């Protein structure tokens, strides 16, 4: 540590005990390169000091820390000893910068005076006092620096702790969020598991209920079937002895032909002039109903679904009588069309179509007359009607169609269409009523109608019998022979032998393909290999 004399000596310039007694500057002997004047040294007035008796000052006890600091500074080594000669110099150079080393100055005259005048004690006291003040300032500055360092360390430590606390809280928040997310995921998984279990349980219960319902329905059908067979047995003698009245059949045929004309006059044409809202409603329903028949499968579940949808669509039109009959007529046409297109190539499809048709016939009684009229128009064999086809009118009455070239369709196409329609009719006659209608409604197309068809064809004049008659008999056999035997027993067996053996023998010379197939079916039955359409699945 270095001290600048101007700081030491000039610190108390205002003290009355000091005055300027000498000047150490010399313009001739100064070797200082700076043009600035050298500072003056203010010393106590020797005249006053010399005459004034020094007062013994009390000993100052320093703080141990300060005393150690002073000892470390070794100030004694930095002061000029009293008895050491001082190299003469023309002037004392005191640098303005406190960072520059203090050059040695020559004060031989001053020291000599100090020695001689015994005035060194006050000077030393002044120096010591000034030095103590400087040291106190240094101590205070050091204390402030230490305090500042401690404060900085405290702030740094607080900041570190704050960051650590924030990091800890952040990690805790993240962990908490993760735990909450995990709990939420587990909760969702548990809810999903419970939902699936509930759905599976509900589906199982529903299947069990449906199974029980089907079993109960089958049991009731078996009981009703027995009762129905008992009633049929009472009628079989009358039916066996009945004589075919072709005049009555002809009147029935023309009745349904007239019904077709009436439908056109009273239902179809008026709808074209009806309110636009009604026409729009029917148009929408028509587009919805058309594909329903093609969606039928061998599944009862699918059948029930389509039944409900069609029932709802029909009920929507009940508010308007004209619209209601129009939609029923449209459904009758659609069913017959499905029979002559789909059933002709896939006869077993007649079973779901027949079940749907029977349900609609019972649910909407107004449909029965409309449906029968459409059947007779397309296939008069359903009532046992036959006429000559060597005329234009005769072919039209028997349901022949013209192709795109305005020519009559070929025999194969005609036979297939008739077989498809009669398969549907035979299925309807041998089906039991839906469970909900058994006790309240009679069968609209009972199995007795199948007896009528067979008996009337057997009684038809041989000159009117064609291959088509044998084709439709074969279609009927596939669809209803098993149930016919169950219904009429021994009388049914006699009638089957009549059409399968005697009628085919009478027409043997014609070599009809349909007759040959009918004999094959007869032989299969006689060999206990009679087959029927497979029952529908649940």
From Swiss-Prot:
It holds the Pfam family GLE1. It is found in: Nucleus, Nuclear pore complex; Nucleus membrane. GO terms for cellular component: cytoplasm; mitochondrion; nuclear envelope; nuclear membrane; nuclear pore; nuclear pore cytoplasmic filaments. Residues 131-244 form a coiled coil. It comes from the Eukaryota. Changing residue 353 to A: Partial loss of activity. The keyword Protein transport applies. Residues 257-538 are annotated as: Interactions with NUP42, DBP5 and GFD1. One of its GO terms (biological process) is poly(A)+ mRNA export from nucleus. Changing residue 351 to A: Partial loss of activity. The keyword Membrane applies. A motif (Bipartite nuclear localization signal 2) lies at residues 272-288. GO terms for molecular function: enzyme activator activity; inositol hexakisphosphate binding; phospholipid binding; translation initiation factor binding. Residues 21-33 have a biased composition (Low complexity). Keywords: Coiled coil, Membrane, mRNA processing, mRNA transport, Nuclear pore complex, Nucleus, Protein transport, Translocation, Transport. A motif (Bipartite nuclear localization signal 1) lies at residues 154-170. InterPro entries: GLE1, GLE1-like_sf. Residues 9-39, 151-226 are annotated as: Disordered. It is a peripheral membrane protein. Component of the nuclear pore complex (NPC). NPC constitutes the exclusive means of nucleocytoplasmic transport. NPCs allow the passive diffusion of ions and small molecules and the active, nuclear transport receptor-mediated bidirectional transport of macromolecules such as proteins, RNAs, ribonucleoparticles (RNPs), and ribosomal subunits across the nuclear envelope. Due to its 8-fold rotational symmetry, all subunits are present with 8 copies or multiples thereof. GLE1 interacts with the NUP82 subcomplex via NUP42. It also interacts with GFD1 and the ATP-dependent RNA helicase DBP5. Belongs to the GLE1 family. Present with 1040 molecules/cell in log phase SD medium. Functions as a component of the nuclear pore complex (NPC). NPC components, collectively referred to as nucleoporins (NUPs), can play the role of both NPC structural components and of docking or interaction partners for transiently associated nuclear transport factors. It is specifically involved in a terminal step of poly(A)+ mRNA transport through the NPC probably by binding the ATP-dependent RNA helicase DBP5 and GFD1 at the cytoplasmic side of the NPC. This is mRNA export factor GLE1. The gene is GLE1.
């Amino acid at each position: 540590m270095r001290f600048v004399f101007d700081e030491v000596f000039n610190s108390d310039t205002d003290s009355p005990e000091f005055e300027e007694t000498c000047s150490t500057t010399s313009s001739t002997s100064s070797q200082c390169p700076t043009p600035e004047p050298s500072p003056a040294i203010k010393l106590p007035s020797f005249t006053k000091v010399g005459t004034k008796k020094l007062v013994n000052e009390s000993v100052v006890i320093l703080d141990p820390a300060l005393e150690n600091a002073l000892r470390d500074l070794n100030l004694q080594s930095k002061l000029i000893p009293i008895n050491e000669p001082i190299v003469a110099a023309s002037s004392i150079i005191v640098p303005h910068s406190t960072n520059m080393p203090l050059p040695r100055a020559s004060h031989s005259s001053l020291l000599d005076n100090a020695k001689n005048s015994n005035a060194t004690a006050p000077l030393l006291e002044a120096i010591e006092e000034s030095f103590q003040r400087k040291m106190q300032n240094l101590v205070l500055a050091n204390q402030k620096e230490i305090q500042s360092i401690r404060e900085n360390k405290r702030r740094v430590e607080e900041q570190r702790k704050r960051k650590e606390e924030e990091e800890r809280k952040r990690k805790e928040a993240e962990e908490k969020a993760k735990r909450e997310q995990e709990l939420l995921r587990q909760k969702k998984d548990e809810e999903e598991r419970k939902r699936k279990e509930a759905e599976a349980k509900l589906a199982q219960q529903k299947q069990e209920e449906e199974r029980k319902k089907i079993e109960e329905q089958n049991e009731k059908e078996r009981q009703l079937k027995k009762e129905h067979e008992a009633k049929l047995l009472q009628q079989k003698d009358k039916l066996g002895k009945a004589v075919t009245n072709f005049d009555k059949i002809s009147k029935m045929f023309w009745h349904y032909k007239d019904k077709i004309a009436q439908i056109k006059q009273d239902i179809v044409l008026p709808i074209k002039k009806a309110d636009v809202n009604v026409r729009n409603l029917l148009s929408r329903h028509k587009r919805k109903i058309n594909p329903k028949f093609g969606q039928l499968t061998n599944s009862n579940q699918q059948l029930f679904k389509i039944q409900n949808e069609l029932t709802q669509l029909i009920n929507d039109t009940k508010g308007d009588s004209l619209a209601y009959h129009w939609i029923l007529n449209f459904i009758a046409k659609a069913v017959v069309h499905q029979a002559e297109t789909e059933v002709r190539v896939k006869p077993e499809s007649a079973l779901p179509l027949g079940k749907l048709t029977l349900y609609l016939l019972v649910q909407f009684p107004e449909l029965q007359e409309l449906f029968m009229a459409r059947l007779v128009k397309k296939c008069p064999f359903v009532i046992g009607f036959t006429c000559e086809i060597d005329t234009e009118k005769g072919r039209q009455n028997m349901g022949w169609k013209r192709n795109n070239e305005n020519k009559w369709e070929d025999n194969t196409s005609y036979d297939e269409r008739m077989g498809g329609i009669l398969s549907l009719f035979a299925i309807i006659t041998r089906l039991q009523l839906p469970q909900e209608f058994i006790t309240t409604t009679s069968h609209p197309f009972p199995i007795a109608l199948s007896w009528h068809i067979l008996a009337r064809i057997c009684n038809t004049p041989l000159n009117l019998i064609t291959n088509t008659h044998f084709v439709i008999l074969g279609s009927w056999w596939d669809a209803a022979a098993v149930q016919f035997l169950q219904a009429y027993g021994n009388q049914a067996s006699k009638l089957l032998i009549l059409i399968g053996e005697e009628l085919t023998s009478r027409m043997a010379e014609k070599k009809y393909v349909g007759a040959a197939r009918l004999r094959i079916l007869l032989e299969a039955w006689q060999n206990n290999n009679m087959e029927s359409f497979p029952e529908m699945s649940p």
